[in-house]
Structures are given as C-alpha cells and as structure tokens.
C-alpha cells in the first residue's frame, strides 16, 4: 500500500485507543481474510474516499443483506475482474489470484441471491408499467383504442426497460395521476346516451373546400372533383377529409380516387365549373396515399392507380379527431424542380368523393358499459327518480376529451336492488382487475363506498363509479401480487399474460390457472403458443421492440432542412421506418429466425418510400412487404435500418459515440460505464472543415476518456456511412464549405453542399474492418452474446427483474440448448417459461 494511503485497520486501532467509536466495517472486511487483503492492497489505492477513480468507491460498502443495492456493485466488480479489465496492468492479479477472487465473490453473490429469494423472492413487488396499465384498462373496459398511459406516472427506465421492479418508485403525489387515469378511462366506457346514428355520411369535394384559401395553389376544385398537385402543408400533408366525429370508436372510411395529371396554369382560379373546366389528364403512375390523424398515428396506406377505384379502411378514432389524408408522393409545396422551373404538367391526385360511417357498434350499450353495469336498464332521469342528476360524461378515448352537453334527456342506471346488484357487479369486475379470486371482505369494502354514495342520493351509476375508481387505484390492481416460492396457477396466469400480452389473462387462461393445470409444463407451453398466435401478442412484440431498440425516440429529432432538405418533415417516411423495424422483429418471432438476422439478413420489409430511400428498385405502394435485398446492399438486419440510424443521431450530424453506445447496449448488452462529469462533449462541425473522427481523436487524448472510447467508437465509425435519416452516403454535408451539388430525387432537385469523405473503417478487439460489410462479419461472430442480451431482456419482460448472478448458469444452459438452431427468437421466448426465474417469485 502506498505511504500516502491510510490503512483502515490502523484507523480503527487509533480510534479505539483515543476512545472514539470505531467506524462500521464495510461488507468485504468481514469476509475471508485473504479476500479482504486483496481488496485493501489492490483496489483501495484507486477506489477509496480519497481517490474514487472513476467515481467508484469500495471502502464504504455496506453488507449486501443490509443494503441489497450493493450486490449490483459487487456484481460489477466481479465482471470487471473476471474479464481482466481490473485491476489495472500495474497491479494485475495472477491467474490463480483472479480465480480465487472471483470464486469467493461468486459464492457471496449466490448466498445473497438465495437469501433474497427466501425472504422476498427473486423480484420485489412491482407495479404495472404505463403500457401494461393501459392495456389492462383497455381489456377491462373493452376499449381497444383507449389511451390512458399519458395519465400515469412516468416509468423509470433501466437500459430502456420500463418494468424493472427495483427501479420503480411510487410517491403519494403520484396517486393523483392514477385517479385521473381511472376517471378518464371509466368515463370513456359509460354510455348514458341514445345509440349514435351510424348512417354513412358522404362528402363531396365542394363541401370539403372550406379551407381552400389557406391551401392556395395546393389544390383546386374541378366540378365535383378535388385535384391536388402539391402537398397542401409544408410537406407530407395532412389534408383534412372530414369534420371530427364526437363519438369514439371504429369508423369505416371510403373514398373514390385516382391519379392524374394537370396543367399548372389551371390552378390560377380557386375552383372551376361550367364551361371553364380545365382538362384532368389521365395519370401515368401510381401514388401512395396514407390515412392518419396526427404525427405518429397513421392508420393505413393505399396504392392509388390511374383507374378510378374505391378505397376502404376501418380505423379507431378517439373522438374529436379529424381524419387526414397524406399524399406522400406529391412534391412539397416549397420543392424546387431539377430543371429550375415548374413543369407545365404536374402529377395530380384526384378525389371524387369521400365517406365516413360510424361509430360501428356491435351492441348498445357497448361492451365496456356492460362490464360496469351488466344488463341493468337505462332510464330517463327526472326529479321523481329520487336521485341527484347524473354527472356529465367526457366523451373520447384520446388526449382530447369533450364534456358531453346533453341536448335533451338525462339518463341514469336503474337498479331495483342496489345492494345485490352492486355486490354482483363489483365482484365480477374486481376478479378481472385483480387477476385472482376476491374475498367477500374485499367486495364488502368496495360496496360500502357504493352504499355511502346512495345514502347521499347519488344515482346508481355515480355511486358505482366511485368504487370502480377505487378499484383501478388499489394496490391489488396496480401491483403484481405474488408470494415467495413457487408461483400458484393463478399467479402463473397473471405473469404469463403480462409477459406475452402485456395485460390481463383472458377467461381461458384464468380458468387454467385456478384449476392448477397451468403449473404443468405441457399446458403452460401450449398456452404460450396460443397466446403468441393471438393478435394481442403484437402488444408484446411492439413493446419489446420499442424498449429494446429505443423506437419511442423516433420523433425526438428532426433533420436540419438546410443540410437535408430532401427529408423535410417527411412524416410518412419516418412512420415507415418504425413500421419496418416492428415488422422485422415480428417476423423473427413468428418464424423463429436465428438471432444472426439482427446483424444481417437477405430481406427487409419495405414500401415504395423506404425502397427509394434504400436504393432498392421494383417496390411500389405504401404497404410494407417482405423484399429480398439485392446483392451488395448495405441493408439487411436491424443494425442498418433507417429507424435505428435516426434514433442514434441528431438533426444536424451523426455521432459515432452515440451510435457506438447504442450497439454496445442494445445489440451486445455490454453498455459502457457512464462518462465522468468532466468528459465534455463534442460540438458538430457543420462547416465541413473537420470530420467527427478527427474531433474524437483529439478527445481521446484525455486519458480518462481513451479507455472507454476504444470500445465505443469503432461500432459508431462502421455506421458513419449512413446519415441522420439512415440514407447511405460517401461524403459529409456542410452549411458553408465544400462543393455545391444538386441532389436529384425523381423530378425534384435539392441544393446541398458536400464536404469531406466518410471513413467507416475501424478496429475492434484487435480486428480491423474497412466498412459496414466487414464490421457485420465481425459482429456476426458474437451471436451468442447477442442471444444472451436478448434472453436477459426477455427475462426482464417476463419477470420484472434483471438477471442476478445466480441466474447466469440457467441462462447459459438456455443458450446451450438453443445454439444448434441459431438461437431462434421464438424459441428463446418460450425457453424462459421452464426456468425457475419464471416459475418462482
């Protein structure tokens, strides 16, 4: 030990002699003397109260049983020492010392894991994530389009995962958010009004032209047809088709349209009729048209042809949402043509008529209302009814809710026997919400709330809504109730439903759980297969893809329109990017594809927009479909999908650091430690004078930065051949320096400046690569580590707990069992079901 360092044993001796209290021993000091000596003599020079190198201390760690969070620190120490990364070269352990160190520390970690499982279980009690809450309320109230997550407390994420129990927190102030979420959800389900009129409403273009002055040269009316030659807004639409329906629900949308061509001079007038009618020329190409409402909420797309045809889609509208059409292939209003002037004849999109029908109602009152009030009759309210007037109901299932203003009669739920009906309805609702049978005493507590409301002359439904609101805010609904040890059949049903549906078990799964049949391995696996084939499994697949890959960040950046004018607000392209990645993950799971497809594949899911973006010919229309990639394409796999390349960039420039960290964390599951506070940042150079590689070389001269960047930067360099939207490039762009060029996109021309050449070469783990192709070959050799990362993430989705040290042996056994088949994604999902981590709390 250095002379300047204080010996802990000496401090204790001096303190004792002087009559001062002896400092509490750190956890490692009470362990085996040889191990404690290795810590004191090798680690504390850099990691005590004086040095804290890397902002990391070992001298003051409490025992693991007193502070379970220290187990994560010791696990980190174990991994760094086991990999030979610590101690540093000057004080490296011999092989024998390293083996003794890791063997002893491993035993301590296993002992801690065993003690934790005996006392509280492998996973502590956790609450539903925001997505799980929303799905559960949707299923409880039979409202498939309900949005409720925005009302709930924000999830604390752990490496992108939102259901890690140890990271969750619930303050008293957050209860107000759940009260608001419950109120909004219940009101969306209540239907105290006559059945809405569902007659189709047809709109002629002349009636849709109320806002034509705002669009000016974007569209014109020719008799009863609407003709568009440019996107009406700054870019990809939207153009409103209808007034906003008040009622939430499914709506059937139909419109008759075709593509065409038209002389630009015809747009001199706002509309045309009678003898002054310009000719709409036949179209010579198909166009992609998409339906949506707001950014990130597209419903459907159509490949509209030159032949007049009717197009149809059924969509969920939240209420007070205006449906919009996006003419994704028409040029932007501000676009310049490569010729430098507007052409005489423009491509056009022609709408003959549009129609909306809905809400489409299977029954009235709807299922959600019946889940709350059964078949109790609805009556017109009057003062003679003996109860106070019913509260106004806010209509809608989205962010915008409008309070219903009765224009005539008020209605209320009539019960001849409120005591009996409330008990019956509450028990049914509580058993579904709590995911288990409920005790009579639990029902009685909630029923007391109803009876108190009735004593205050509330009408029956308002009194019941008080209890329903309490149920949706109770710990029994918000938290996962499990006892330490083997899970019961009912607990297994709840866990399996949250894993594969992110929601509640259905009636079949609940019955199998209550009967105990679900504890049989073959029954459990059969149910899992059934659930994966159910449409509700898309919730799991999309949620897993979003969290694993960070897809929710897709709209967090916008390309700078000066550097990347061709991408200006191209929301349909961005939406296509996200859908491509989700479809790819879905295909990997449905077809049990080997894990190597994450790195590279010979196919992609493309529509015309994405295919054009990727340089793949022969794809038409807005619908995604599986496309075989041409030989030599840099695409294939997840790594080079545009969504991934966008979320790992900002709007100005790409960052090898950000992309490198993304690859290490999301693909390999080996996230680097957080940067020290004094690490600084690198400002992008948009002048084109220096490359990001040159800036990083200067940054790495700082010794505290060099070690981490040695592992972070190479994957990021490999992806430098892709711009901020995932477009392939060989040169950087600049705002000032470089050469002026005209970038061609069909008939359009964009003025840009190209600067220095892109260098996507690098070296990782002693192996050199010259481009993305060679980097992929190196990364493919890490398929076991990639599969390990996927298993670890699936385990969190399934249980709510990060893998412990003791779980590692089981995970390695699962990897061994799946190695021969290339670690198929579906197989990995199912393999977790037979592990003690899934079958025990």
Q: Residues of each region from the PLM?
A:
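Acidic-and-aromatic substrate-binding clefts and catalytic sites of carbohydrate-active enzymes
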Residues: 64-67
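N-terminal secretory signal peptides that target proteins for export/translocation
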Residues: 1-6
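Low-complexity, glycine/serine/threonine/alanine-rich intrinsically disordered linker
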Residues: 29-52, 69-76, 81-82, 93-841
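Short secondary-structure junction motifs
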Residues: 53-55, 88
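Bacterial N-terminal signal peptides
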Residues: 9-23
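Residue-level detector of conserved, well-ordered beta-strand and adjacent loop positions
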Residues: 59-62, 87
